[in-house]
Amino acid sequence: MQKIRRDDEIIVIAGKDKGKRGKVLKVLADNRLVVGGLNLVKRHTKPNPMSGVQGGIVEKEAPLHASNVAIFNGETNKADRVGFKVEDGKKIRVFKSTQKAVDA
């Protein structure tokens, strides 16, 4: 079970976007996350009339390493760590500071 999943709200704790918050769009296999509106890079694309792609400079989200982000706890308005707890035979994610469920 992953500590950070898609649609989690995270806060960046290291790097050029430190302190910014965003929502996880995609979790990649190599422990990296794509976060909406953060870690933007410019990519130069060639026009491709066959697929309808217009050329130019496109800004898109690049992946961040999971160690540079922390899950955002809306109750405390701070970055938090994630732990696991077994309730009713199911393993759930909980915030370390409040011991409340992340997905609640």
UniProtKB/Swiss-Prot annotation:
Biological processes per GO annotation: translation
Coiled coil segments of this chain: none
GO cellular component: ribonucleoprotein complex; ribosome
Positions of disulphide bridges: none
Record keyword Zinc-finger present: no
UniProt cross-references to Pfam families, sorted A to Z: KOW, ribosomal_L24
Record keywords, A-Z: Ribonucleoprotein, Ribosomal protein, RNA-binding, rRNA-binding
One GO molecular-function entry: rRNA binding
Keyword Ribosomal protein belongs to the record: yes
Function: One of two assembly initiator proteins, it binds directly to the 5'-end of the 23S rRNA, where it nucleates assembly of the 50S subunit. One of the proteins that surrounds the polypeptide exit tunnel on the outside of the subunit.
Quaternary assembly: Part of the 50S ribosomal subunit.
Family matches, as NCBIfam families: rplX_bact
Annotated family: Belongs to the universal ribosomal protein uL24 family.
Protein name: Large ribosomal subunit protein uL24
Species, as recorded: Pseudomonas fluorescens (strain Pf0-1)
Encoding gene, per UniProt annotation: rplX
